[in-house]
Amino acid sequence: KMRELIPYATILTPNLTELYALLDIDYPSEIPSYDELEKMCKCLVDKGAKMIVVTGINVKNKLINFVYEEGKKYRIVEVEKIGDERSGTGDVISGVIAGKYLLEQDFYKSVEAAANFASKCIKYSQELGVDNHLGLCFEPFLKEL
């Protein structure tokens, strides 16, 4: 059903698993190259999406966010990987991207702001000792957005 909504989407924010599901492709044993990611994003653009960020690609203690906009060269937003995965991180990232974009911020800058915001919240959550399944503590930092 999600695939049917692609033509109506301006922004898509899939992680790798979701990207492969949207394209109905089997999940690979290796992380795709940037060229492969670009081809997959172009397929989503061909289906109607305008902007895509493939979030949270784990590469050597870094998290890569692959940013693709229709008609432009892809760009990368990279942040340090902090701890293990936390529930809700993708939701926070998607929310910040949407909010910043609606405030007429450039898409790439929106992704950059979202990645940095999530990193700050994850670090704070770890300092507080919050269990990963409880997500990230973002409320103290909302005013910074």
How should these model regions be labeled?
Residues K1-Y74:
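Conserved phosphate/ATP/ADP-binding segment of small-molecule kinases
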Residues M2, I93-S94, A118:
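Alpha-helical structural signal
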Residues E18, G56-K60, E80-G83, A115-S119:
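Glycine-rich beta-alpha junction loops
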Residues A21, D84-F107:
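Short, small-residue alpha-helix embedded
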Residues K73-R75, K100-A114:
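Phosphate-handling active-site elements
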Residues Y74-G88:
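Short pre-catalytic strand/loop immediately N-terminal to key active-site residues, enriched for Gly-Thr
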Residues Y108-L145:
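Charged C-terminal helix
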